[in-house]
């Protein structure tokens, strides 16, 4: 630990590239972003699309990105399903990158345990050794969160242990994390109206909301007419200096490629001119 004067602090340089990984403060190096939503809201496909965008340094739904080495760690779906989805998306979008790494471990990996931390550390070290460009930032995608905990997802001790271990990895290996997670069950008030608490709809302890730098929410908007369109919103952007409006995305089932079909217009603000890509 070092104690800096004002001059020393202003002269300090981080041990990693300081470029924003996703612009507008959405994802900065050494931070944690969560993408959450209910079952069937295309979260995993969103994470695959995001992984390809970062690995290629191409825009993610119109937001510029910095090229990164991306390690997608999927513990819910069988390897064959991930292979089929990734292949279909890659063919449909004509996208490929040597900066992408995937793992679907056969055994459970719990990051609220010492053994789980050690195992993921080994995996990250292997990815860094095999990276085509060691200068690129490393982004680790964990999907889904609840399977990375041996304890209960609402238990304060277990949640803090998970967060401490992830923080240790961030600091020691200069890692940026993206975590895929579920929303809690929908609640209604006495009049039958749905109660929506924004980022507080994350399943589990409020310690998640407090810890995360960015929270991206995906909500299915056409469950009875195609089940293929979601609304994406930024429920928390700790490091953004501007308000980020949401947008609607249609997922094309024939190739698993997404398309922005509408952007939210904020009253009293100028409409966004960001490309619909």
Language model segments and positions:
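Conserved inter-motif catalytic segment of the P-loop NTP-binding fold
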Residues: 65-161, 168, 251-254, 264-267, ...
């Amino acid at each position: 630990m070092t104690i800096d004067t004002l001059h020393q602090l202003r002269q300090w340089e981080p041990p990693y590239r300081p470029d924003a990984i996703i612009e507008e403060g959405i994802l900065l190096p050494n931070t944690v972003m969560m993408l959450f939503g209910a079952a069937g809201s295309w979260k995993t496909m969103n994470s695959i699309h995001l992984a390809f965008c970062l690995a290629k340094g191409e825009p993610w739904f119109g937001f510029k990105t910095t090229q990164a080495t991306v390690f997608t760690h999927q513990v819910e779906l069988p390897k064959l399903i991930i292979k089929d989805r990734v292949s279909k998306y890659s063919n449909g979008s004509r996208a490929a990158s040597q900066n992408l790494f995937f793992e679907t471990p056969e055994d459970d990996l719990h990051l609220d345990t010492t053994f789980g931390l050690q195992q993921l550390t080994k995996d990250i070290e292997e990815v860094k050794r095999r990276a085509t460009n060691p200068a690129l930032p490393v982004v680790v995608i964990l999907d889904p969160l609840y399977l990375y905990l041996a304890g209960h997802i609402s238990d304060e001790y277990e949640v803090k242990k998970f967060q401490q271990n992830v923080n240790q990895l961030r600091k020691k290996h200069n890692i940026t994390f993206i975590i895929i997670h579920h929303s809690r069950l929908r609640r209604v008030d006495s009049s039958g109206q749905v109660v929506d608490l924004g980022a507080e709809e994350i399943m589990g302890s409020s310690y998640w909301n407090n810890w995360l730098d960015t929270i991206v929410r995906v909500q299915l908007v056409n469950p009875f007419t195609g089940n293929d369109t979601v609304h994406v919103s930024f429920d928390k952007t700790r490091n953004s200096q501007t308000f980020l409006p949401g947008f609607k995305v249609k997922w094309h089932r024939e190739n698993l490629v997404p398309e922005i079909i509408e952007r939210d217009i904020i009253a009293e603000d100028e409409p966004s001119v960001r490309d619909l890509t």
